[in-house]
Amino acid sequence: ANTFRFNFSHGDHQEQGDRMATVKLAEKLAGKKVGFLLDTKGPEIRTELFEGDAKEYSYKTGEKIRVATKQGIKSTRDVIALNVAGALDIYDDVEVGRQVLVDDGKLGLRVIAKDDATREFEVEVENDGVVAKQKGVNIPNTKIPFPALAERDNDDIRFGLEQGINFIAISFVRTAKDVNEVRAICEETGNGHVQLFAKIENQQGIDNLDEIIEAADGIMIARGDMGIEVPFEMV
């Protein structure tokens, strides 16, 4: 291996710092230098924690349940709550007819109505499956107004730069602005040499690919998430 990837979607700074220290020790023992790549968590949507002791909820095709966009509430079997990066309420951004895909598309929900009073979607279950807490959620063909750089990513990047990372993989890049904000942090901290790789994972990133390529040092085609956001045969 000549580069080690540190996935900041999981673990805290203590855990990541310990991993980096282990690799640095291995460098000394092997007499070889390797690259350190920080992979950001990025802006994302996940299912919320559950009320009570439930670990997951099971659903059958054709069932009708609700999805809540209000932030800071817990899920029940009848109302699945979403945790959105930046604490955004995405109710107004999602149209009737859109799919809500849970856990890499293992469960599909179709928005059939919107309740303005509760700011909840009424959804129909498209296949038998389960919903567990803190699982990833994708809403294809929907532009979510995430901040260019989430507070957590900002903190993680600054921590990684202090540890001497060489590369940053920026998750869910949608526009050149996403790359430029990370570049500004690198330059501000005297780390302008760090190379930035934009991860293309959704339709908006595809639409703005040319400007993203201009802004970044390289791109990664994250076919896993992209295969959920766009038709698989288009990846």
What do these predicted ranges mean?
Residues 1-235:
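Non-catalytic helical/linker scaffolds that mediate oligomerization, partner binding
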